[in-house]
């Protein structure tokens, strides 16, 4: 049975005070939560969050990493820096990194490799734009994104990778993906992995990252191939985030 995972992506939000309040509120409501819960926080707050979560069931993650160990890369953060703050997870290939910072499939695959080689679990984000879906290229785009990773690290590595499907066209656009649309793409992703190794495909958790919220979380996670969510805006509100965690 695959593990249900709820990962919060705070993006470039919060403050020192807000971080303290949000984490404490989440921790206070975790008693009945059975899923694995991860919060991926801005780099400046990682030490603060590490101290707050302690040995609780709340897991710390980062939002990106640089493939280099160190050097003249102003503004970047290495995998060792991330691990210094107790993080065990890192988001890789988020749609905003792909679109705003021009990270292509090869760069994303390299980041996955660096994370795995340094005992961090990558949350590999994949997904298509509106024009891709409208032109019937969803499967083609998603296939290329996954294939780049398989080509570099191999199918067996997916035992240690969490996949997150982001339908970019359904994030902050007012367009909503139906549970069936989400399930169809999740099933396709799993079938692609199965072409290489059926066992790996069955144990790989595939999260949904298309504006999951307390209203649609249960219906989405009732779908056969949806194993949790990568949560954006709703992860900044403790009660909303906890409702999603408990919906699983």
UniProtKB/Swiss-Prot annotation:
Reaction(s) catalysed by this chain's protein: D-glyceraldehyde 3-phosphate = dihydroxyacetone phosphate
Signal peptide: none
EC number, UniProt record: 5.3.1.1
Binding site residues for substrate: 9-11, 172, 211, 232-233
Keyword field contains Transcription regulation: no
HAMAP family per the UniProt record, alphabetical: TIM_B
Record's GO cellular component terms: cytosol
One GO MF term attached to the UniProt entry: triose-phosphate isomerase activity
Catalytic residues as annotated in Swiss-Prot or TrEMBL: 94 (electrophile), 166 (proton acceptor)
Compartment list: Cytoplasm
InterPro entries with a match to the protein in the record: Aldolase_TIM, TIM_sf, TrioseP_Isoase_bac/euk, Triosephosphate_isomerase, Triosephosphate_isomerase_AS
Matching Pfam families: TIM
Pathway(s) it belongs to: Carbohydrate biosynthesis; gluconeogenesis; Carbohydrate degradation; glycolysis; D-glyceraldehyde 3-phosphate from glycerone phosphate: step 1/1
Gene behind the chain: tpiA
PANTHER family assigned: TRIOSEPHOSPHATE ISOMERASE
CDD domains in the record: TIM
Name under which the protein is recorded: Triosephosphate isomerase
One biological process term in Gene Ontology: glycerol catabolic process
Reported function: Involved in the gluconeogenesis. Catalyzes stereospecifically the conversion of dihydroxyacetone phosphate (DHAP) to D-glyceraldehyde-3-phosphate (G3P).
Enzyme class (EC, first level): isomerase
Domain of life: Bacteria
